[in-house]
Every structure is written in structure tokens, then in C-alpha cells.
A protein has these predicted regions:
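Order/disorder boundary and secretion-linked terminal/linker segments
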Residues: 15-90, 198-203, 207-214, 259-281
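Acidic/polar low-complexity flexible segments
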Residues: 16-36, 93-195, 227, 241-281
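Short, hydrophobic/aromatic-enriched beta-strand segments in well-ordered soluble domains
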Residues: 79-83, 233-240
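Glycine-aromatic-enriched beta-strand/loop faces of beta-sandwich-type recognition domains
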Residues: 179-223
Length: 281
């Protein structure tokens, strides 16, 4: 089973003391966002090892390692998990006789980090809880070449969103209905989808190519590297971007979060942690 990561974060009250804590200590120098965990900041950071499995599994079988640091201006989060296979292609174009066709058997490893904007938080997407999250997504093929993450909002509502909002109706754990939408933040994203080339070049060419992000879509840096059967992924963002679609962090603030992992973009296994707490010193 392969793991990729997603961190979902929410501000809360009393329940914060009941969950394991990921402590983000203040450091003089933040780590370089290069997909490596050899910086001094990471060596001194406190590690949290969290169980990760299917949402309803009470005794997780896998573990994921988390660390966090900040410098008073920006925060960095490090995720490390075991994955025996490196999947860093996503539906590339493969030459088939006389034309390029998407190879849908190739799907990337994937992880995301989300922070609550409104409502009660539950790490289970099918909990049926109305809420909004600020979400960061790292993708081994689509985002990693650019050094940035997708920055978007997850919204869960009982009422159907306006027709202009692309949404999906899901059945929750109690057999109720909830609508899910996940628009990207305003601005230019860190990759774009291209048309298949008409003339043959390489046998396989990417369908998604990096581009320079701008606006709120450029808030989150992210870089991952696979080595020795593990993914190492680093994220970095300002504590407070000033954008309405981003969760604001601050020293002394405690925030609920969870980590989810996607094998080959959920064409394989999808796992998630129970609720954890990010504590910013």
C-alpha cells in the first residue's frame, strides 16, 4: 500500500487537548523547500508519527512522519511516508501507431494539506459535516516540477451550491446527502493541461506542464523527492497571507488537522489519520 499525504487543519476549542500534537517551533532559518529533510531546522524539530488508514479503521496499520517549524513569518511542514513505488506520471500522452493517446493507467502519487475556514472539522470527507477548508495539494507529476502546490477550498454543504459552482453529491456515513465542491484559489495555477502534439516526438510526453503561478494560487510552495522506498514532501506558506481563502496561522495558536494519503491519485488506496493538532509556538 502506498501513501501520499494531505494535511487538513481546523481551529477548535476544548477537543484540541485530546489529540496528538504536532509542535511547530520557531527557528532562525527555515529549511530549503527541495524535497529533502537534511536541513538543521528539520533535525531539531519534534517528530510526530501518526497512524494512517481508511477513515473507519480504529487501529491504523500504517504510519506517517510529520514535522513543522516557523520563523514568525512563514511555516513549513514536512511529511515522510513509505511508498515502495515512485509514481510521478499522470495520464501522459503515449504514441500509439499514428497519434498520441492519454495513458490513463499512469497515475501520480498525491498528497494534500487543508485548513478549516468555517464549520466543524472532521477528517472523514463523508462525515456529513458542513464546513469549508483551505487545502494545499502536492502532486508528484502535475505540481512537483513547478515547486508549488495547488491551493484550493473544500466546501461541504447540505444545500446544493449554485449551478455556476461545480459540485458533487455524496452519500455520507449516515446515508444522508452532502454536496462537495473544491474550487482552486484565485490566480494562475502552477501547471496547465496541454493538447496532444500532432507530430511524433518522444514515445511518451507529459499532458500537464509547469507554469509560474500567480495570485492566491501562488501562496504555497511544495517539493517532493522519492528515495529508498519513501516520499519526502515539504510545504511552505506565510503564516498569514491576507487572502480570504487562506487560513491564518499565528504563534500561540492551536489548530486541528489530519493527514490523508493517496496512492496513484486514489486509483489505488486512500487513507487518512484521525484528528491531530498543530501547535504553533
Amino acid at each position: 500500500m502506498k501513501l501520499l499525504a494531505a494535511v487538513l487543519v481546523v481551529v477548535f476549542g476544548a477537543p484540541l487537548q485530546q489529540a496528538p500534537e504536532l509542535v511547530a517551533a520557531k527557528v532562525a532559518k527555515l529549511p530549503a523547500i527541495d524535497g529533502k529533510a537534511d536541513d538543521d531546522a528539520w533535525k531539531s524539530a519534534r517528530e510526530l508519527k501518526a497512524g494512517i488508514d481508511e477513515p473507519l479503521e480504529e487501529k491504523p496499520k500504517k504510519m506517517i512522519s510529520l514535522k513543522a517549524v516557523h520563523d514568525g513569518d512563514s511555516i513549513c511542514i514536512l511529511l515522510v511516508w513509505e511508498d515502495p513505488d515512485k509514481n510521478d506520471q499522470h495520464c501522459p500522452f503515449a504514441w500509439k501507431g499514428s497519434a498520441y493517446e492519454p495513458d490513463e493507467e499512469k497515475a501520480e502519487d498525491f498528497c494534500s494539506i487543508g485548513f478549516a475556514l468555517e464549520g466543524k472539522f472532521d477528517s472523514d470527507m463523508k462525515a456529513g459535516v458542513e464546513s469549508r477548508w483551505d487545502v494545499w495539494e502536492w502532486c508528484a507529476a502535475r505540481t512537483n516540477p513547478s515547486g508549488f502546490a495547488i491551493d484550493r477550498t473544500h466546501a461541504y454543504t447540505k444545500a446544493k451550491p449554485p449551478e455556476a459552482v461545480k459540485s458533487k453529491k455524496m452519500t455520507d456515513r449516515n446515508q444522508g446527502q452532502i454536496y462537495f465542491s473544491h474550487p482552486v484559489d484565485e490566480g494562475t495555477p502552477c501547471f496547465k493541461k496541454i493538447e496532444a502534439p500532432e507530430k511524433k516526438g518522444a514515445d511518451v510526453v507529459p499532458q500537464y506542464v509547469p507554469q509560474t503561478p500567480a495570485g492566491s494560487a501562488a501562496d504555497v510552495q511544495a517539493k517532493g523527492e522519492w528515495a529508498n522506498g519513501k516520499w519526502t514532501v515539504e510545504f511552505k506558506r506565510k503564516l498569514n497571507t491576507g487572502h480570504k481563502d487562506d487560513t491564518a496561522f499565528a504563534s500561540g495558536k492551536a489548530v486541528e488537522f489530519a493527514v490523508a494519503a493517496f496512492d496513484k491519485c486514489e486509483k489505488g488506496d486512500h487513507v487518512v489519520t484521525k484528528t491531530l493538532v498543530l501547535k504553533i509556538q
